[in-house]
């Protein structure tokens, strides 16, 4: 235990407070040092490119991870990363691509760039991930209200780096544009989409700015404001 004074960075000089506290966390009295890193699981087959945690139907946590060609679940009993990829695993991710995951009403959904369409795992009954038929491949994914929101997408053999593509209302399986509020939107003059933050509305991060996507219902579905 390190018995420093209270952290008071904005006080005058020569007070009893500490102005710099590195590698410590607050404790009942003062601060205590952070613990060293320790190994949590056995190794995957390749460098991990994403990790995600979600609770299953019983409330127990599950940990998922992905590398360049596989998706894994952490097995607590033996600390292994068990391959739960779809049959045949995945086309290798691009050099700069990573796995990004969401929890959508109990379904864990993963996006990994332009080489594989969205993957889904029912966190109560599934043993393997599976393709979401007719979904796009996407570099970015988020939950926005009752929609699965993707950005910087590829489908139909074409790549759309400045396009968002969202699912049908309250459905992760509906991706027919113009049906049940599934639709697309190009973000012009802002460069490629570099990220999406979900929530009540979409915060779309682009190379040259930020766009807000707000649900307004039919016929527009979402309104996008720069």
Regions found by a protein language model. Give the residues of each.
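Surface loop/turn motifs at the tips and blade-to-blade linkers of beta-strand repeat domains
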Residues: 40-45, 89-93, 130-134, 185-188, ...
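Tryptophan-centered short beta-strand motifs
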Residues: 78-84, 125-129, 224
């Amino acid at each position: 235990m390190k018995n420093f004074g209270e952290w008071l960075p904005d006080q005058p000089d020569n007070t009893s407070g500490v102005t710099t506290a590195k590698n410590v966390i607050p404790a009942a009295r003062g601060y205590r040092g952070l613990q060293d890193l320790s190994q949590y699981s056995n190794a995957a087959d390749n460098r991990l490119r994403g990790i995600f945690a979600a609770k299953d139907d019983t409330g127990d946590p599950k940990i998922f991870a992905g590398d360049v060609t596989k998706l894994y679940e952490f097995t607590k009993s033996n600390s292994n990363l068990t391959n739960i990829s779809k049959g045949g695993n995945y086309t290798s991710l691009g050099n700069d691509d990573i796995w990004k995951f969401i929890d959508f009403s109990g379904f864990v959904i993963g996006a990994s760039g332009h080489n594989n369409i969205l993957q889904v795992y029912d966190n109560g009954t599934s043993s393997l991930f599976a393709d979401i038929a007719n979904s796009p491949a996407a570099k970015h994914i988020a939950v926005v209200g009752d929609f699965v929101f993707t950005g910087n997408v590829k489908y139909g053999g074409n790549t759309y780096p400045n396009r968002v593509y969202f699912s049908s209302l309250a459905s992760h399986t509906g991706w027919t544009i113009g049906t049940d509020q599934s639709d697309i939107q190009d973000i012009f003059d802002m460069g490629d989409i570099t990220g999406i933050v979900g929530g009540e509305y979409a915060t779309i991060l682009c190379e040259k700015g930020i766009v807000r996507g707000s649900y307004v219902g039919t016929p527009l579905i979402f309104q996008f404001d720069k």
